[in-house]
Amino acid sequence: MAMKILPVCPFSRYLAVLVLAFAAKGAEVSVDELLEQAGVSFAKGMRENAIELANNAIEAEPKNARAYYVRGRFYAEMRQVQKAMSDFNRALLFDPSLALAYYHRGAENFILGHIKESAGDFDRFLDLAPGQAPKLWQRGIALYYAGRYEDGRRQFELHQTINRNDVENAVWHFLCVARSSGIDKSRVSLLKVENDPRVPMMQIYALYAGRGSAEEVMKAATAGKPSPPELNERTFYAHFYLGLYFDVAGNEKMAREHIFQAADLFKVDSYMGDVARIHAALLRQQSH
């Protein structure tokens, strides 16, 4: 999605702030320095070196929650989900109040298809950091797949307060309302979006608003002369949000056709790519 959440600054800078905060609690300086160096190395693309430095920090202090958290962040960025999960679990074992570990474990749980656990982690993150609630669009998506549609609706309404021109947020709000109250109600309560510059988002918005068509979405996605990566991304989003629309409208055939194209033929290496993959897996489970 276009929507972003923590960290909002470069990872190495964010990590430096994190380790300084822990240093104030009396953590060993040597471990802090190792983790800061690891963050700088990772930001420079020296990933193996960053992992080695994090390993050294863990060896120096095996029960240091932040060391596992930092290494888990590295593994998550490297798309090594199981290793990231293991480190976030250990971080929370040693410090159950480490809010960001719940947030990142929630994202990894979702990627693994552990929907209920993902929603629970995001809930716990908000318990510990309630001020972050408007930013947490990932929680809204987890709530949708967990069947907690009213909670999801409220989450996307919160996000609208800080991100008013994101069609995806409006679409997920639509989906939550449609599941709980029907499509007619969801159109009446569709969140207002005036200008999402990403192609073909405004055509997707028109479809959900009841004044557009699937043909217009696909035509917009392939218009002009986008680069191959941009064309793939446009086509992914077109198929994915068409599939979600047909799914909630009860058109199983068209839903499967578009979702499978998004997840299998035009896949993208991003969180939304993972959402499409999870949705495709759920559809395949339903057919067995």
Go through each PLM region and give its residues.
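Helix-start (N-cap) detector for alpha-helical repeat units in TPR-like alpha-solenoids
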Residues: 30-31, 65-66, 99-100, 133-134, ...
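Register position in tetratricopeptide repeats
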Residues: 43-44, 77-78, 111-112, 145, ...
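Canonical positions in the second alpha-helix
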Residues: 56-57, 90-91, 124-125, 158-159, ...
